[in-house]
């Protein structure tokens, strides 16, 4: 799956988990919106979630994921695995084109429609067309500075916005 039009980044440092997403929505080669909100808090404010891909599909997945969080008592790991299983096996969900990046204070997961739940090795992860740029910048800042998680997300997202034509610098940031 190839997703244009977004960058979502999460960084964890010193007990802070911070997620940022750009605001650009692109249709083909046209920017339709510059201030979309692709990052939100779920699970009574204890879980961060961001999406790359179709907005309508992502809203469906946010709803399903939040239901899984409730079903599993806020257990992010179990909710992520159960959503991925449903996403892979459900006839309707299988057609949804999006990726989810979810995190709490302890865990970070990328959830795909292929039934994959990926937990990164580091305290950072990113999805979307600008994800590789944001992730590279975040890793460099994590390794070489004492910046807070929020400052790293802000700086890395700005760098991604300078490089990726499908990412703007109108950043929405949430933290737990």
Curated annotation (Swiss-Prot):
Belongs to the peptidase T1B family. HslV subfamily. The keyword Protease applies. Protease subunit of a proteasome-like degradation complex believed to be a general protein degrading machinery. A double ring-shaped homohexamer of HslV is capped on each side by a ring-shaped HslU homohexamer. The assembly of the HslU/HslV complex is dependent on binding of ATP. SUPFAM superfamilies: N-terminal nucleophile aminohydrolases (Ntn hydrolases) (SSF56235). The active site is at 6. This is ATP-dependent protease subunit HslV. It comes from the Bacteria. GO terms for cellular component: HslUV protease complex; proteasome core complex. Gene3D superfamilies: Glutamine Phosphoribosylpyrophosphate, subunit 1, domain 1 (3.60.20.10). The keyword Metal-binding applies. Disulfide bonds: none annotated. PANTHER family: ATP-DEPENDENT PROTEASE SUBUNIT HSLV, METALLOPROTEASE TLDD. Na(+) binds at residues 161, 164, 167. GO terms for biological process: proteolysis involved in protein catabolic process. The lineage of its organism: Bacteria, Thermotogati, Thermotogota, Thermotogae, Thermotogales. It is found in: Cytoplasm.
